A protein has these predicted regions:
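A short acidic Gly-Thr/Ser loop motif
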Residues: 1-5, 131-135, 153, 258
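ATP-binding/phosphotransfer module of carbohydrate and carboxylate kinases, centering on a glycine-rich
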Residues: 2-59, 68-74, 93-101, 114-124, ...
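Short beta-strand segments
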Residues: 61-65, 105, 129-135, 139-141
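Short hydrophobic alpha-helix segments
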Residues: 22-24, 79, 150
């Protein structure tokens, strides 16, 4: 799972049983030129540690935060990977790994498939996975099939426009994307704007260098301004999910990624706002 901050890696049996997991930092310097080399080194290191030869490894799957074509190619630059993209990731990584088969998919799409296969959505035919991390990703499965779309961009819900008056630019180059409000970076950005707009309001985050986790922690501890930001974020995300529900009518939404670790301080207002916006049969 290649993210903007870390790459999370797992060693699995072919039955889907997780044997071990670890992570390595994502080096996005120099337009991400070290990303695949570092991934290959991490995989090879674990293979050596476990005494695994290349022929004993069935394959390697990589989830990337952007569109993917034909389970091989990342056709555009990924907004949260420092300009990295436009690669035949499968071919390049396979070569680095001595010919091991490599398949590539959008991170949220493969997360959704994993949840339907072995996780929270096991048995579901239609579900939507939302990943809240450095960016916002989405994986949409309808009647058992991933919605890839014509250009591999199906489910890119982080780039749904939720504010057409936004002047700040998203990493994708557009304005007013969901990712600008509901990702970890978006929460920090919006919290800073709220602090600037309310200079006389007390807030435990004022004057500090904070992360999204700190905003949720402050809201949980009773900080009114932080709670206001969390509610705004939940409202924006709830509206986006309601719009997706009206289009795909999923059996469930699954929320993952680092921001989801906030727990009930996020999910309680999110469910409330979703119900406010959702079509009554969804």
């Amino acid at each position: 799972d290649l993210g903007g901050t870390t790459a999370k890696i797992g060693l699995f049996k072919t039955t889907g049983e997780l044997l071990e997991k670890w992570e390595v930092p994502t080096d996005t310097s120099n337009a991400g030129e070290h990303i695949l080399k570092n991934l290959a080194a991490a995989v090879q290191g674990k293979m050596q540690e476990k005494g695994l030869a290349a022929e004993q490894v069935e394959g390697v799957g990589v989830g990337v935060p952007g569109p993917v074509l034909d389970s091989r190619i990342v056709p555009i630059i990924c907004a949260n990977l420092g300009g990295w993209g436009k690669h035949n990731v499968a071919q390049e990584l396979s070569t680095m790994l001595g010919g091991i088969r490599v398949l590539v998919g959008n991170d949220a799409n493969v997360a959704a498939l994993g949840e339907i296969w072995m996780g929270a959505a096991k048995g579901c035919r239609s579900a939507v996975m939302v990943t809240l991390g450095t960016g916002v990703g989405g994986g949409v499965i309808v009647n058992g099939k991933v919605i890839d779309g014509t250009h591999g961009a199906g489910g890119e819900i982080g780039h749904i426009t939720v504010d057409r008056h936004e002047t700040a630019t998203c990493g994708c180059g557009k304005h007013g994307c969901l990712e600008q409000y509901s990702s970890a970076t978006g929460v920090v950005r919006c919290m800073k704007k709220l602090l600037d707009a309310n200079p006389d309001t007390a807030c435990t985050l004022r004057g500090k260098d904070f992360e999204a986790k700190d905003v949720f922690d402050a809201a949980r501890a009773g900080d009114a301004l932080a709670a206001r930001e969390v509610d705004e974020m939940a409202s924006t995300l709830g509206m986006a999910l309601a719009n997706i529900a009206a289009t795909t009518d999923p059996e469930m939404f699954m929320i993952g990624g680092g921001v989801a670790r906030a727990g009930e301080v996020l999910f309680t207002p999110l469910v409330r706002h979703y119900k406010e916006y959702a079509f009554q049969s969804c």
